[in-house]
Amino acid sequence: MDLNTYLKLLNLLDSESQKIMLELQAMFSAAGLALRGRGTHTDGIIVKGNLTVLHSSDVPSHSLFTPGKKYDVIFRHANIVGGAKDDALINGRGSAIRIGNIGDDLSKPRLLDLVLNTGEVFGLPTARLYHQFFGSDFHQKSDMLASGSLRRYAVEAALRNPDSFTELYYHTQLCYEWVDSKKKSRYARFRLLNPNQSTEGGLLDDSVEIGPRLVLPRKRGDTREKNYLRNEFRQRLTDGNIVEYVLQAQFRSIEDVAVDCSNIWDPNTYPWLDIAAIVLNQDESENDYYQEIAYNPGNTHYDLKLPNSYSVDDFASLGVSGALVHYFGSIVRAERTQYLYGSKDDLPGKPVYFPLPVTEIPSKRFLFLLEKYNFLTDNSYPSDGEHDKIEALVSAMPTTALDLAVGTTDPTDIPDSYFLERRLNGYNPGAIRESSGQEGWTHELTHNLAKYDIKPGLHFPDFVQCRLFVDKQNGVKLHSIKIDDHEITPCQEQWQYAKRTYLQAEFLSQELKLHLARCHFNIEQYVMAIKRRLAPTHPVRAFINPHLEGLIFINSSAVPKIIGSTGFIPIASMLTQGSIVDVMKNELSKLSYMWNPIADLPRDIPGDLFTPAATAYWELLNNYVEQGLLQPFEDELRTEVNAIQVDELFAELKERSLYSGDQPPKYDSSELKSLLMYIIYHSSFLHSWANFKQYDDAGNPNHVSMGDYSQYDQQTQDKIRFSQRSLTWVLSSIRYNSVAVYGSDLLKQLIREKSSILEPGLPLEDLMMSINI
């Protein structure tokens, strides 16, 4: 079953029925997400074998079931109720068969899937009742049982307490339209049984009280191990034996009543006929290749199809609901398996060596933008490495803000006024902290690299601190810069050296701590958890998704060019490769989504544009999350199916978190609003501010670098200088999905109301929806 078939089945339904089907999909997908697997039939055993079509004159001829024809099969047994890992629970049992030609890759849909369960019939005749049952509590289900809308005999027939999977009979319950070789149609139902089993086993005795529950506790005194059914089946194959089944079918003429899967077809009138023999001989339960097979009753043969449904009230709706639910669930499950974590020792998110999830493939528009600027880094560097050509390329790059500030003076002479303004409003914002009990200065910016390793033979200060004196009437003044144990003041000869050294330390800190750790990798852990734990239809995911676009792709494809073994920072900085990663991990260990910028920033510093802008953006995000999600979707968020997914989201965040501070989050749904505000603030506002100022602040290596390159040979120096110039230009140039164009009407309105506070520091055209560069 593919997307076209899915849409065709869905579009045959009336609008109310489509809504109910979509809700069913969401319910089952949520169950699968909560169980970290399938929503039903979660734990099972997988085996391979073959199927041989039998000769029978009573079976109508068929293009798939041609006597003597042989096929490969992949087969699965499982307990029906998802999450019921104990085989000794009184539960329904299931089997699923995928049939393919000899040699087919059976991990993908092939000729036919059959999904069969214990019980000759299903307990609910229509998709509307199925939807009602799935969304009901115990008392409501009891009422359905009492009223007869939930068929008691069907519930009783499904529950089994067997000693082996092989002693049970399994039924499709659904009927299929069987088209014979003469193009005559009839309906068919299938069942599977052990040819050596004359009667079905595992039946319940009268002492078992049946209610609306689909699984009952194990019987008192039952000491069988929790996975005894799977172990028993596996042991049969381990001993060199085979497991045999016979596939049978009933046939009857085309009539609506036949499609009702809650009614038994009298075997005296519609006898069971042998169709095929199945031999299973190879356990594949430990083979990850087959673990995520998505069996679907909608994966049908062109001469064997489910009857069409036009309403959730017709009998055919149950079969169509199964096809739609299984298809949607497989997408959700497959999506989750594409978002794979590496070791907890890795940086958070998807390791770059894992394949990119299909849903993260960027748009053609973004790829066009990326290609537009890639020539700067990929193709324009002179292959001969000639110094004069490189100098010409570097000089030809656009002028930076620092170039304009320095003007025609000595390029190493950085004006104090410019230096001070960029500490307040440049590419490393929000780093100023109030000092305590110091004489002469009130605030400071500190970069401490003492515990990190420097490359052999090179030198870089362990400690660099810029000290400021803040007077609300007279403004901000530079007090001094401390480098290791030496304090250097503006009146000293070494003052320009001190400023350049500070800029080197800040350049490294901005890239590793703020830009990469706090924005890129920090937010990727939330993207991963959201994509893995929330179904695509979940209100939270639908709301936050525009703020997640592009991050995983850019982290996988472009970030290695910055911090990979041959990337810019490992070559340009004085730190070893290991220490570069350690700096980012250390920063990540301090980060929690239970944070806000208002409490973290200095107040009322003259000339500070960032603090009021950050405060204003945080305040508007409060309204954005409330008015865009929490209020309009209040009832939907409270439903069990959606609440379970949010709980799973927080559980995964807790499990994967690198936070090691003394005030960890609670990791529960009470913090959902804080989480969403935190993600959007970093994805949109903070990354936009820091990223688009990189070229102005650090684009010219004559003014700012990550270290002293005089110890390198000329070719290496040239390569670093060119890389810095071109890389910061590309990072600062690509604009994709600006809020002004792609934001929701609500977000645009809220930003316009704060534009007079935001725009002095960040032009609104530079405010993006997500981290995508």
UniProtKB/Swiss-Prot annotation:
Q: Does the keyword Lipid biosynthesis apply?
A: yes
Instruction: Kindly tell me the pathway this chain contributes to.
Output: Lipid metabolism; oxylipin biosynthesis
Recorded superkingdom: Bacteria
Annotated catalysed reactions: (9Z,12Z,15Z)-octadecatrienoate + O2 = (9R,10E,12Z,15Z)-9-hydroperoxyoctadeca-10,12,15-trienoate
Enzyme Commission (EC) number: 1.13.11.61
Q: Which UniProt keywords apply?
A: Fatty acid biosynthesis, Fatty acid metabolism, Iron, Lipid biosynthesis, Lipid metabolism, Metal-binding, Oxidoreductase, Oxylipin biosynthesis, Plasmid
Domain Lipoxygenase intervals: 176-773
Fetch the InterPro entries from UniProt: Catalase_sf, LipOase, LipOase_C, LipOase_C_sf
pH dependence per the UniProt record: Optimum pH is 7-10.
Biological process according to GO: fatty acid biosynthetic process; lipid oxidation; oxylipin biosynthetic process
Q: Where does Fe cation bind?
A: 515, 520, 773
| GO terms, molecular function | heme binding; linolenate 9R-lipoxygenase activity; metal ion binding; oxidoreductase activity, acting on single donors with incorporation of molecular oxygen, incorporation of two atoms of oxygen
Enzyme group, top EC level? oxidoreductase
Keyword Lipid metabolism on this protein? Answer: yes
Entries under PANTHER family matching the protein: LIPOXYGENASE
Into which family does the record put it? Belongs to the lipoxygenase family.
Q: What does this protein do?
A: Catalyzes the conversion of alpha-linoleate to (9R,10E,12Z,15Z)-9-hydroperoxyoctadeca-10,12,15-trienoate in oxylipin biosynthesis. Also converts alpha-linoleate to (9R,10E,12Z)-9-hydroperoxyoctadeca-10,12-dienoate.
Query: What is the designated name of this protein?
Result: Linolenate 9R-lipoxygenase
